[in-house]
Regions:
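Extended oligomerization regions of viral-like shell subunits
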Residues: 42, 46-47, 155-243
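Short, Φ-rich (hydrophobic/aromatic) sequence segments
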Residues: 13-22, 147-151, 228-246
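Short helix/loop capping segments that flank catalytic or ligand/cofactor-binding pockets
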Residues: 56-59, 176-179, 271-272
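Extended, compositionally biased alpha-helical segments that mediate assembly or anchoring
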Residues: 245-288
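Structured, hydrophobic secondary-structure cores that serve as assembly/anchoring elements
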Residues: 47, 53, 66-67, 73-101, ...
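N-terminal "assembly arms/tails" that initiate or stabilize quaternary assembly
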Residues: 1-76, 282-288
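Alpha-helical scaffold segments that mediate packing/assembly in large oligomeric complexes
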Residues: 93-160, 280-288
């Protein structure tokens, strides 16, 4: 098999990474619709629409309407998340088998390392930009129901639309609300567009990304644990792109008799500055 053909086999797996991401990620449901964004500068920047309106004014029968402004501007934002990793797979007699090995490696890497980090970064980003952020040292048993209910009321009072609100909550909080009974908890959860249980390991107020070594992320020292996060989807800008895999065949590899595969992902996670009330954060204090 030619090197060109085998490289094509490896690259054929790249589009599948997008599908694997969507299935494994807890936050992919918040991805901004592709028709609402436009890429510039080699996909390093995105252009998103931003609408500004004015309220009603008096109408005078003699002079008519009071002038007002309605503007739709395009805001350019730079990608704020970019990560990568280079892998090596020993050269094999059957290069097609090497392609399958890469597919399995990439899939497992995405599920076990990439997706948890992407979710954690997004939660931390939205936490930092949340319009409302109460904190409790502890939450009493059966207290979660009241706290999430209060969050819903606060968002409604802030005139955040009740549709398209997504609840992200810890397993402890989810279980506590379920203890209210099947009927009551179902009615409660049905108020949300979706309810997602998030492992605490992805649910921090702030995270630190490792620059080298084993890579990955960790809770930033002093950052609180997130109890729950309610996101009105139109309030956030969430974009993710997978770079086509960089393939170096064994003949070109000067370090070893192995295939090298470069994986790279970049994206944008942000909250519209005029829609911060569309993100409600509740955290618990931690001691370290």
């Amino acid at each position: 098999m030619s090197q060109d053909l085998s490289a094509a086999l490896f690259k054929a797996y790249t589009p599948l990474l997008d599908e694997a991401y969507k299935l494994a990620s807890l936050t992919s449901k918040l991805d901004t619709a592709s028709e609402l964004i436009r890429y510039t500068q080699g996909s390093r920047e995105v252009v998103v629409p931003k609408m500004t309106l004015q309220g009603l004014a008096n109408y005078d029968r003699a002079s008519g309407y009071v002038g007002g402004e309605a503007s739709l501007t395009l805001e350019t934002l730079t990608m704020n998340y970019e990560r990568g990793r280079m892998f090596s797979i020993d050269s094999m007699d059957n290069e097609e088998t090497a392609g399958v090995a890469y597919g399995r490696l990439a899939g497992e890497f995405l599920r076990s390392y990439v997706v948890p980090e992407i979710d954690a970064v997004r939660f931390a980003t939205y936490a930092a930009l949340a319009g409302t952020h109460p904190t409790d040292a502890t939450i009493n048993a059966t207290g979660w129901y009241a706290l999430v209910s209060a969050a819903q009321v606060a968002m409604t009072e802030a005139e955040v639309p009740e549709s398209d609100r997504h609840l992200f909550i810890t397993a402890t909080g989810h279980a506590d609300i379920l203890n209210k009974g099947l009927t009551e908890s179902k009615v409660f959860f049905d108020n949300f567009a979706s309810v997602t249980v998030v492992p605490q390991a992805r649910f921090y107020e702030a995270v630190t990304l490792a620059a080298s070594g084993a890579g990955g992320y960790s809770r930033t020292t002093g950052a609180n644990n997130i109890n729950f996060l309610i996101v009105h989807k139109p309030a956030v800008i969430q974009v993710l792109k997978h770079q086509d895999a960089k393939i170096i065949n064994p003949q070109q590899n000067q370090d070893a008799d192995a295939w090298k595969f470069g994986y790279r992902v970049y994206g944008l996670n942000d909250v519209y500055d005029n829609k911060t009330k569309g993100v409600y954060l509740h955290t618990s204090q931690v001691t370290s």
